[in-house]
């Protein structure tokens, strides 16, 4: 077990475990080969890695990191501009929706406030959160909950094992659901939503009925 304390009390960096590394003020690495490399970041678990300001990675091989260098990612916004990460791992082009997002990115970096919880879970963007084994959240303010779930659209959310929210502000609820279009909602196991701003309760091959719906309050 190894513990490293650096600087004055408010800026302690602490690492506990074989080859654990805490390399920034306020960082905490707990577990064998864990690494917390940004201010106030936390990495807990074997091979856990947290590379975002104030980011939290908990679980064996859980990971918070910027997207790989040299990759182009078309997941931020529906204008397909996406972001580009240069050879040094720096974001050189990114589509953001608010001035506050732009300010946070410039001040603290791409993975500020990200959270990954679960075996090999990973989050790769501003306020992205993933919960569950192999879950992944890659877009700004995206949320993935459930094993092998994936949220790649700006402000998208997915809940359920193997569910996918792939478009901006899309929502997938249920096992193996797919929300593939802007503002779409896929509701119920294996439902697929392929059209913008629509709610799907099934797919081309899976049909469902919506029952027990009350009358509306106004006549048209």
Roles of regions detected by a PLM:
Residues 1-19, 23-134, 138-220:
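Small/polar residue-rich beta-strand/coil "junction" motifs that cap repeat-based extracellular fibers
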């Amino acid at each position: 077990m190894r513990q490293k304390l650096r600087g004055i009390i408010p800026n302690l960096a602490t690492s506990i475990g074989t080859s654990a590394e805490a390399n920034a003020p306020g960082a905490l690495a707990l577990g064998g080969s864990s690494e917390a490399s940004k201010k106030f970041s936390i990495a807990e678990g074997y091979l856990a890695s947290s590379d975002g300001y104030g980011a939290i990675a908990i679980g064996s091989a859980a990971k918070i990191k910027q997207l790989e260098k040299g990759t182009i990612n078309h997941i931020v916004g529906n204008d397909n501009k996406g972001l580009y990460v240069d050879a040094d791992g720096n974001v050189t082009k990114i589509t953001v929706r608010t001035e506050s997002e732009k300010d946070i990115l410039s001040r603290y970096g791409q993975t500020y406030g990200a959270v990954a919880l679960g075996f090999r879970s990973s989050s790769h963007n501003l306020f992205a959160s993933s919960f569950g084994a192999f879950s992944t959240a890659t877009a700004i303010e995206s949320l993935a909950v459930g094993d092998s779930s994936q949220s790649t659209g700006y402000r998208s959310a997915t809940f359920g094992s193997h569910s996918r929210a792939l478009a901006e502000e899309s929502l997938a609820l249920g096992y193996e659901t797919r929300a593939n279009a802007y503002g779409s909602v896929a509701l119920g196991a294996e439902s697929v939503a392929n059209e913008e701003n629509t709610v799907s309760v099934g797919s081309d091959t899976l049909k469902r009925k919506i029952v027990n719906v009350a009358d509306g309050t106004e006549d048209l």
